[in-house]
From Swiss-Prot:
It comes from the Bacteria. Its cofactor is [4Fe-4S] cluster. This is 3-isopropylmalate dehydratase large subunit. It comes from Methylorubrum populi (strain ATCC BAA-705 / NCIMB 13946 / BJ001). Heterodimer of LeuC and LeuD. One of its GO terms (biological process) is L-leucine biosynthetic process.
Amino acid sequence: MTAPRTLYDKIWDDHVVDVGPDGSALLYIDRHLVHEVTSPQAFEGLRVAGRKVHAPHKTLAVVDHNVQTSDRSKGIEDPESRTQLEALAENVRDFGIEFYDALDRRQGIVHIIGPEQGFTLPGQTIVCGDSHTSTHGAFGALAHGIGTSEVEHVLATQTLIQRKAKNMRVTVDGTLPPGVSAKDIVLAIIGEIGTAGGTGHVIEYAGEAIRALSMEGRMTICNMSIEGGARAGMVAPDEITYAYVKDRPKAPKGAAFDAARRYWESLVSDEGAQFDREIRLDAANLPPLVSWGTSPEDIVSILGTVPDPAQIADENKRQSKEKALAYMGLTPGMRMTDITLDRVFIGSCTNGRIEDLRIVAKMVEGRKVHDGVSAMVVPGSGLVKAQAEAEGIDRILKDAGFDWREPGCSMCLGMNPDKLRPGERCASTSNRNFEGRQGPRGRTHLVSPAMAAAAAVAGRFVDIREWRG
């Protein structure tokens, strides 16, 4: 009798081509996503070796990191960014890969366009030269980031040499209170386990609160698995998954969809399957959260205060948190609701989907962005932007004083014109608050879309459970 297996075990086993004497496995890769930053050297390696792309139809390319989110008719000003975009256009043409350029209405952030095109499906192995590839695990896929040399290996062979990770399960039961979202769940998880807590593991997210989430919410949680140190994050597929996937452009159709669904329904962890680590959270006890430091583990309730590093026993950790406070310009004991803001950024592969934008529009309709705040909303893709405009969301946001942009990674990272100026403080719906992440000496606070929207109007962080504008 076969031993009970986890969701991760099942997908891994289904994709092992061969196992080496050292225990490493040659893993078949179903889907490969590429963008302009981590792919140029990989394609050049193929040229030098005289190789072709093994399965061009299993790779999808898009520009996202370097594209400007303002007027695109002027082109890219930064020469290095322009070179990377031009290189990707040339590479996909030479190797026969489907490509969404900056003017394609399907263009967007790589981890948003994959799911919305139906390129991402349950049970697949999915890789990309980007750490937030874990996003696709929301569909019950094994998805993780890879390095540039591995990008070349996948292009050439459609395989990767991997070592199997350990299994970890995070169970979130209960019902989320009003004003608390998927972003708060994943920030709470990272706050609980730390940024190294998932190291060497693939996390399966389970429980009543996870099952109640939309696909957008599940993608938000899986997106930040890497911030918890995990190799990947996964949610078992269910009716919500199937409904999202069905009729997507690249999803199976008709009898092929029915056959695929029968397989997808087997993608659940068996009763009695063993996990190397288990974590449990009660969703009912979660408040809206805000990050205060320079690590995603530095989180606190909106009604909390900036912690005092002097209370930390470990000297190295204490010094690290003292450095974070100095960088952020905060003092121990300061109330989070007293922190004022210069900028608000709503977007990214964490929170740039239509559900996120609907939440923001609902929060700010009939209100105005605070005089001292510059706020921008960047849709995650051209299709998200078009849907938002069809619903009138853009009008609501622009009337409130938000800058409505073209799709791209934007201010999530300082690789394009959307950057913080030194010393500026930003409420951001993105996934990382490292030093300089959004621009040199910029200060980033991670929050949910609703929290960011309210902060834009109030000019400071507020408890959205009680906020009325």
